[in-house]
Amino acid sequence: MSIRDWPAAERPREKLLEWGAASLSDAELLAIFLRTGVSGRSAVDLARHLLAQFGGLRPLLEASQALFNQQLGLGPAKFAQLQAVLEMAKRHMAERLRHDSVLESPKAVRDYLKAMLRHEPHEIFGCLFLDSRHRVLGFEALSQGTIDAAMVYPRQVVKRALAYNAAALILCHNHPSGSLEPSAADRKLTKLLQKALEVVDVRVLDHIIVGDGDPLSMAEYGWL
């Protein structure tokens, strides 16, 4: 049965307009993005099938173009649309942060860093640079690879902090495995960067680790 033949209250688009996007299931949200189904499958049925094939919404959103295009009902146009939606979401969160103090909106910071880093297949180390009022000046990914071998040079972090004229910063990196447990190397690097940045009077407010679930704050655990 086509979605058009469903009762209005059960159609994903109508439900979204009436109750908001948060009221929809993953399959219903994906169905709105897909717009149409394929022969023998409505958009919702196709969405359910795709979620089962990929193992959930996150793996689908993080899929490579090659893997994405292998699925019936998907293709280069849909992949491009999806990447545009994801990038707009990142930029929206970045814009929100630029207008607020980090200390007043820690959840927004974590949401932003999660959006920036969670989908990356490799470990990325970056910094969120802040002014004296803890407003965001910018974000930069400074290295790629495991923390042990990522070549995170303190002088590089100091150089970028001075370039932004930052008064403080938040360190961050992701664990592609999904684990949120900081390694011994993570803690060692944090202490090393703290000492290097103290010399130029730049405070390290936190080191956020992005994995499965809510990002972990090393500051909240007393590891800073």
From Swiss-Prot:
Residues 102-224 form the MPN domain. One of its GO terms (molecular function) is metallopeptidase activity. Zn(2+) binds at residues 173, 175, 186. InterPro entries: MPN (IPR037518), RadC_JAB (IPR025657), RuvA_2-like (IPR010994), UPF0758 (IPR001405), UPF0758_CS (IPR020891), UPF0758_N (IPR046778). Coiled coil: none annotated. Keywords: Hydrolase, Metal-binding, Metalloprotease, Protease, Zinc. A motif (JAMM motif) lies at residues 173-186. Pfam families: RadC, UPF0758_N. GO terms for biological process: proteolysis. Belongs to the UPF0758 family. This is UPF0758 protein PFLU_5982. It comes from Pseudomonas fluorescens (strain SBW25).
